Amino acid sequence: MAPYIIWDWNGTLLDDVDAAVYALNRLLSERGLPTVTRDFYRAHFGFPARNFYIELGMDPDRDWERICVDFHRHIAEAPQAIRPDAVEALELARAHGLGQSILSALRQDLLLRDTGRDRLHGYFDEIYGVDNLDGASKLARGRQLVAQLRSRGLLPEGRALYFIGDTLHDAEVATEFGATPLLVDHGHQTAERLAATGCRVAESLPAAVRMVI
């Protein structure tokens, strides 16, 4: 049976790094803190996002809910689009009989809105986001997604499972729920950081799919 792919959304299929840097710098400016460059962001960002904000001088213990709400308000002001090679990769996977779902740390309603806006729902068996704006771990939802795929008969015993993402957290999550991690180097963390995991790193989404086929 052809393998199964679970895709990350933000930074992987969705090109939102510049939007995230814009939103982050709005947060920092509003709090009188120094802004950061895109390169700094990709070299330091990680999950849980709360720890990254502490590194930048914010105080999540005091106003974490406000930080999360403000970040998502600001990121909505910035242009975001699926990556130019995203549909090519999804079509390539479909043509080779690969199953596909999404797992994201984005809140479920926002994830469904964004994937619907880009008319991508038809590619995926399941689209799993989280129930908050925290930018924390998606591991629990990943386990639920795998259980759902198994209950639907889409992930029978022996079918190879891959998780394609763009962060160290994606590699950790994949390993925890039994998938092989594949990382792409265009997202929220640098290629150097990703390579240090020992995972395979692709230069494009179609290249990642070809590693699975």
Language-model-derived ranges and their functions:
Residues L27, F47-D61, D114, L145-A147:
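Helix-loop "lid/cap" segments that line or gate small-molecule binding pockets
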Residues Y4, K138-A171:
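Conserved Lys-Pro-Asp/Glu-containing loop-to-beta segment of HAD-superfamily phosphomonoesterases
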Residues P34, D59, H121-D125, L155, ...:
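Conserved H-loop
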Residues F163-A202:
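Acidic, Mg2+-coordinating phosphoryl-transfer loop and its flanking beta/alpha structural elements
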Residues R119-Y128, R193-V212:
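Structural recognition of alpha->loop->beta junctions
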